[in-house]
Each structure stands twice: as C-alpha cells, then as structure tokens.
C-alpha cells in the first residue's frame, strides 16, 4: 500500500487534517519487479492482506476495511471507532488488525470545520494541533477534551483518547471476534503492526517505541 502521494509517512497527521485521498494499492510481480496499480484515490491505505481472491485493505481516514478485486472496492467492515493500520494473517484463519489510535468527537468536529482546521494548520505548530497522536501526555500544551483532564492524579481509562493502542482479531470474513486494548491511561499506544511467531503475538507500539509480546 501507498498511504499518500502527497505526504510522507512521517507527516501522516498532515494528510489526515488536509483531508488527503491519494492512497493506492499496488501489486508488484516478484519475478520481474513490475508494479501494477490496483486502486487509487484511497483515504490513506495502510494495511493489505489477501482474502478469498481479493485484497483486504485498511482505509484509515474512512475508518473501514474494504475488499479490492477486479471490480470496485467492496466495504467489509465500516464505521470503525478507530484508525485501522496493518493487517496480517492469524493462525487458525482470520486476521489481526492493528489500530494506531481511536476516534474522538473533538477531532471529528475539527475535520468538519474547514475554516478553523485550515487556520489551525497554518498558525499552530503541528504537535499542538487538535489531531490524533501515537503518544500523548508529555506536554501541558496538548489540546484536551474536558473529560481528559487528570483529576487527583488519575486519568480515567475511558476518557476521550488523544492516543490509544488496539489490536483486533478478525474472522475469515473480516468481522471482529475480540480485541486487546491499551486504554487512555496506558502507554502502549500507536500500534502499527502485528506478527505471530510460535505461540506468541508480537505488536509494535510506535508511540513508546516498544515491541510487545502477548
């Protein structure tokens, strides 16, 4: 997958807040290295995995999984409460889907308010934008929703997340079976990849820079 033609992977938040839709799915022939574009105009194509003759793709900015075959993309799982990232096959069938952060009402509101969003991007440093993050809680300058305030030294795990950690086990049909969380009061956020090895599941939490074993 190619998440964005307009922004580098380090500037993913610029692509989100700029309402980017230049992602692609590309097939590369292992014999001669020739590349073939299977789909374009995707809103940040992050992960891809074969599924029943199609390719299952996570489209992060549209919060969904789609199946891409010879025809038009077909929705498989929509209206996710998170920003999906990579997909990998799971032992026994199905898939592991990682999510690098969760959606919030505040960010959804900013994405709809075009004039405010453009002014924010122009006048405020990117690290202080009202936008999702791979990690949070490191600066008092971070934007917050009211319920995200620390009270008596405690941050509620169900508070609106600025960063989050999640991996979901999907069935062979791409439907959720169960999930594992690092909630708002956790630190293993920004989960961008998963891999099974032996009897363990390994996760890459990019927020704290950790490789996790479950």
Can you name each region flagged by the protein language model?
Residues 1-214:
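Sequence-structural signature of mature extracellular/luminal beta-sheet repeat domains
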